[in-house]
A protein has these predicted regions:
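Short clusters of hydrophobic/aromatic residues that line enzyme substrate/ligand-binding pockets
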Residues: 74-76, 224-225
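Active-site acidic/histidine proton-transfer and metal-coordination neighborhood
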Residues: 2-5, 25, 60, 75, ...
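Histidine-acidic metal/acid-base catalytic patches
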Residues: 1-35, 100-101, 157-179, 183-277
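Active-site-adjacent beta->alpha loops and helix N-cap segments on the catalytic face
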Residues: 47-57, 114
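N-terminal substrate-binding region of glycoside hydrolase catalytic domains
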Residues: 30-48, 69-72
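Active-site-proximal loop/turn and secondary-structure-junction residues that shape catalytic pockets
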Residues: 18-20, 43-45, 71-74, 108-112, ...
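Residue-level detector of anion-binding/catalytic polar loops
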Residues: 37-38, 64, 102, 140, ...
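Conserved beta-strand positions in the central sheet of alpha/beta enzyme cores
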Residues: 40, 67-69, 105, 142, ...
Length: 277
């Protein structure tokens, strides 16, 4: 059953990377003018800026800072490099707290020079090392399972079932899951695993875009909602059946859309959100 229609923008969040050509100040101004209520901030947009002041600026534009992207990339054969990743994730947690958001999304990483099982253990150990720091900072860690095509270098966590297993292993309110339709729409167990995620209180974030047919780039050819084959309304229905009523985050990496006029693209995002999500 499809959920109720989205008639306003009260739950619409857009990731800064979706409109990558804009700096964060321009994004804040344009999002606010369009009636968008939430923003997820990618860490690269904060470089060279006072993070606390940037958070204040975003809130002054009426934007809720939904989450920060991204932490993770824990696995490496080299123990020294694994420690560098932990250190960077600690900084990411501190940045999220300073910015004024309570969620840090984790793209967990993988090392193709070692077995996936080793990468998965290193992800578990990395999150375990960070969880006390996250709790002290008031920042929840959202494990984002990625499509299996990214199991080589981007993430060894590739199904929602696996992300649920890992989150539940910590028994912590500070470790949960981010559900991104681009990575999970194909999974025959998706409805069941979304329900499970909600039952354990672990559903921290919901990301939308579309899967284009054909897809011409495995990373940078995501579609605007309605351009592809993902059953967005159905999946949103499953998410909302868990009791989730948070922001719906538009996350689109697209060389095609980044070449377009970004103000026009923003208008299309708003229309597609109402029509197809």
């Amino acid at each position: 059953m499809n959920p109720k229609e989205l008639t306003d923008l009260s739950q619409l969040c857009i990731h800064t990377i979706t409109l990558k050509p804009w700096n964060i100040e321009e994004a804040a101004k344009k999002f606010s003018a369009a009636g968008v209520k939430g923003i997820t901030v990618w860490r690269d947009t904060l470089e060279g800026r006072n993070i606390k002041q940037t958070g204040k600026m975003l809130r002054e534009h009426g934007l809720t800072i939904v989450s920060s992207c991204r932490g993770g990339f824990f696995p490496n054969k080299d123990a020294g490099k694994r420690q560098l990743a932990i250190d960077d994730n600690r900084r990411a947690i501190e940045e999220a707290a300073e910015l004024g958001t309570s969620v840090l999304v984790l793209v967990c990483g993988a090392d193709p020079s070692q077995p996936l099982e080793d990468s998965r253990k290193q992800i578990h150990d990395g999150i375990g090392a960070l969880a006390p720091h996250a709790a002290a900072a008031g920042v929840r860690l959202a494990i984002e399972p990625l499509h299996p095509m990214y199991a080589d270098t981007r993430s060894a966590i590739n199904t929602l079932s696996h992300a649920n297993d890992m989150a539940e292993a910590f028994h912590s309110p500070w470790v949960g899951v981010a559900v991104d339709v681009y990575h999970l729409w194909w999974d025959p167990c998706l409805e069941k695993e979304i329900k499970r995620c909600g039952e354990h209180g672990n559903l921290l974030a919901f990301h939308v875009c579309d899967w284009k047919v054909p897809t011409t780039d495995l990373l940078l050819d995501r579609g605007l909602m309605g351009e592809g084959c993902i059953p967005l309304k159905q999946i949103r229905g499953w998410v909302e059946e868990t009791g989730f009523n948070g922001f719906i985050e538009v996350e689109i990496f697209s060389n095609t859309w980044w070449k377009e006029d970004q103000s026009e693209f923003l208008n299309k995002i708003v229309k597609a959100y109402k029509a197809h999500v």
